[in-house]
């Protein structure tokens, strides 16, 4: 037998519907995970106010990097249903906040109109420490050239440039949308989110740079949590330790992130020999990416 849904308890101080609630408010049971807490909301409260109340009740337990849906317990059906469009609280009810499941099987389709390139922390001070750094610079430059040819926006970050230096000179930043200093490991900063919001129809991010197990990994996980499909370019990302790099890529692949190569990305973006930019991309990839040993350690 299915467990009964919790009844909406009366708020302290009374017995009838709405008893104990301040005048002009309605008692609502807010359910999240295994918890259920009653609270009063204004009569006519809609989606935004319900979200605010969930955050005030459970803020420290809600992973803000995930997407959620609010559901209403429907007596008619005996179960929760997605909150109806235009819903407004008019009587005591039960609502719950449910995380949307991340789709682990992704097709990985890339189109120039729905893709942004993220170049992460390719800075001078990392040169002596990062394995195969010269090779990932070469591949990163190839990707940025491809982005310019195809009109794909590029966002670049630099980790604490005051101490770690600027992006290496071999990387041509001509035409990039944003170059941003940071101290946070992830590239997902408010300025980056604002820049993404200005680009219509963004579905995919092509991510490369350093370090694979730190800034690349944390950026990828945050983006996936926001519903963006992530492609990590294996021949354009590295770490100081190949073990750290290998296990980071394995972990990321298990979460549905696509681990790919620079040539695969560029050819997927043109998709057809008859694409008007195919010849330029073909010239770009005529020289194969360096056989550095990176791909044998994915």
Swiss-Prot record:
InterPro entries named in the record: Isochorismatase-like_dom (IPR000868), Isochorismatase-like_sf (IPR036380), Isochorismatase_domain (IPR050993)
Record key words, sorted: Phosphoprotein
Modification type Phosphotyrosine: residues: 160
N6-succinyllysine: modified positions: 279
GO cellular component, one term: cytoplasm
Coiled coil: none
Keyword Transferase: no
Keyword Phosphoprotein: yes
Protein family (similarity comment): Belongs to the isochorismatase family.
Name listed for the protein in its UniProt record: Isochorismatase domain-containing protein 1
């Amino acid at each position: 037998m299915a467990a009964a849904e919790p009844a909406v308890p009366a708020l302290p101080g009374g017995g009838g519907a709405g008893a104990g609630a301040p005048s002009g408010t309605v008692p609502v049971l807010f359910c999240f995970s295994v918890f259920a807490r009653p609270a009063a909301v204004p009569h006519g409260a809609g989606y935004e106010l319900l979200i605010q109340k969930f955050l005030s009740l459970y803020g420290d337990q809600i992973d803000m990097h995930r997407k959620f849906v609010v559901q209403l317990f429907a007596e008619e059906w005996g179960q929760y249903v997605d909150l109806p469009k235009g819903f407004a609280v008019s009587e005591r009810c039960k609502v719950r906040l449910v995380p949307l499941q991340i789709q682990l099987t992704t097709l990985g389709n890339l189109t120039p109109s729905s893709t942004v390139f993220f170049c992460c922390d390719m800075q001078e001070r990392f040169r002596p420490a990062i394995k195969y750094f010269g090779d990932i610079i070469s591949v990163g430059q190839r990707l940025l050239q491809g982005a310019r040819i195809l009109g794909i926006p590029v966002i670049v970050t630099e980790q604490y440039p005051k101490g770690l230096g600027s992006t290496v000179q071999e990387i041509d930043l001509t035409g990039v949308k944003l170059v941003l200093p940071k101290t946070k490991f992830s590239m997902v900063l408010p300025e980056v989110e604002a820049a993404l919001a200005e680009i219509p129809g963004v579905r995919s991010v092509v991510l490369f740079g350093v370090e694979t197990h730190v800034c690349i990994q944390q950026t990828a996980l945050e983006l996936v949590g926001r519903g963006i499909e992530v492609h990590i370019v294996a021949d354009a990302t590295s770490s100081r330790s190949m073990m750290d790099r290998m296990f980071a890529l394995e972990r990321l692949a298990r979460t549905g992130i696509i681990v790919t190569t620079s040539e695969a990305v560029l050819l997927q973006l043109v998709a057809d020999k008859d694409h008007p930019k195919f010849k330029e991309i073909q010239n770009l990839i005529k020289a194969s990416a360096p056989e550095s040993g990176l791909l044998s350690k994915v």
